[in-house]
């Protein structure tokens, strides 16, 4: 049995390395939407994760990006998901408020998940639908002609529908998932010959768990995102879990920067996380810092097993 588990762990690690190499070869540039703590709530990276905590789960997150820069992005997020119909289905919802410069965008999405269970793993399929509301505060643009038709159009909030689909495979040692969002490419028209559009986004997430002793483990994970039009982003992370309570880790975002993170199981129901990003690259005239905070709550007590494995 021990030999079988060793072979399984090696095969799992090899699969993760192969997936990571695929991601890094395609990574080219950073895109706008970024989170550094997706490992602690995979629902952020892949909606098919909904219900995986086997109880009602809530999470809030705040991110301040490139602090000290005028008009820098910031984001607030609330998510909730729960299993339904035993463990064969799940439902979830995310509400995200993004701000960058004069633009504010509010996104609300609902997710339905169906799960196929195997002996030691499961495959989840998700469909997501929601609305995206966007508005531009013209007063922050310092425009010379405040009566310009285009500016008046920008100042009006508009909402459009959005749909997506996801698939996620999980076992006790491995997770691999693919997500596609904004598939309908909805757009806004602010004035004649002027507008914007939600481009399709695709993401691939993968991770492997490596036990290193009783109550301790190492998690290696990677996330690659592609935005229609040629924008790529890939990142690689490693975390160490100490005594089933404290996560300490870091990561590298290709051609963008490094990050450090700390998470703590405050109780069997409550967990918190904090990350710090140090960004460098051709797109920055000087180094920039970002901070992200995370707080998650599960309605029922999570077992040591479920706490250890993402």
Pin down the residues of each PLM region:
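Sec/Tat signal peptide C-region and signal peptidase I cleavage site
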Residues: 25-29
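Generic detector of intrinsically disordered, low-complexity segments in short proteins
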Residues: 1-2, 309
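Bacterial N-terminal signal peptides
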Residues: 12-24
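Subset of outer-membrane beta-barrel
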Residues: 30-310
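Bacterial N-terminal signal peptides that target proteins for export
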Residues: 2-15
